[in-house]
Amino acid sequence: METSKVYFTNLRTTPSSNLLDKMERLVKRAGIANIDFQNQFVAIKIHFGEPGNLAFIRPNYAARMATLLRNLGAKPFLTDCNTLYSGRRANAVDHLESAMENGFNPFSAKCDVIIADGLKGTEYREIEIDGEYCKAPKIGSAIADADIIISMNHFKGHEQTGFGGALKNLGMGCASVGGKLELHSASQPRIDIESCKGCNICVKHCRHDAIHLNASHKAEIDYGKCVGCGQCVALCQYDGAVMGEGDTSERLNYKIAEYTKAVLSGKPNFHISFIMNVSPECDCWNHNDAAIVPDLGIAASFDPVALDKACADMVIKAPIQETGNRLSDAPHHEHLEGCDKFHLMHPDTNWQAGLEHAEKIGLGTQKYELITV
């Protein structure tokens, strides 16, 4: 496969060129205007952020993108699907309220905001791809029915996939609630009894009441209630909750790649990633821990695989923030420069496997040329 072009701009500004201007210049240079947007419904896939989390992409960027697309003749809308876990984005009413709380509304975003899989997450299209792991991914109807897909991705760490970028935003984010259940279906966690301290944090934070402490003061999971969302794995500071046997981060990343293929199949698509506020974990949490590296910039490409690889490489090469974050607080952190920061934070994950599978199924290539704008 040929090398893909990934365009990048840093975050330096001048009075005549602010960050919104730089983003617009970046995507134009990357060729977004080569897509025929005339009278096309364009889904701008973005994560609205769980209330309390402040690392999500600012709505100002979404508004500038919507205005640019409308000027190109498009009918854009911001969109995301409901969550599997029962937080404040698990149904369309709460999800829209959360989006508005975080600044996403038709006035600020310059376009409508649509929850793609409907009120209760039951509105979806099955898109047949005959994948190795997913035969017919369940994609939110508003996304499946859109003519063009634009992803706006906050690049950060992720407790189950290593990092979250374009593939995660598209593959997991565009899945309906039932689709997310399929993605997580083989990834129910387990309790390592020897490591469990009985601290009760997983019990307190399980939104499905699937965990309790037994008579030995050890956590136990009720697999009849567990949906495999993995929040207990992310919360546990003692490696007491871990990925289940017979399942791996690799398998989840494989499925995400195949869901991404379903989302993009047969449609023009373009992707922008914001390498800012690179927090250790997903924006689905109601908090965001301190960034692990300095803010780096914005990148764009027609190839989501190349884009994710370029962003990962930049974060790995970047210096660790000097103080006050998960990596700088680690012993001997001065020796971690140039190491795989995602694996350091989440040692049970393997983000490389997802990119390899995405490449295998034709989503793009990991070979890229980085062009600075």
Language-model regions: role of each:
Residues 2-53, 57-61, 67, 72-80, ...:
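Extended, low-polarity segments enriched in aliphatic/aromatic residues
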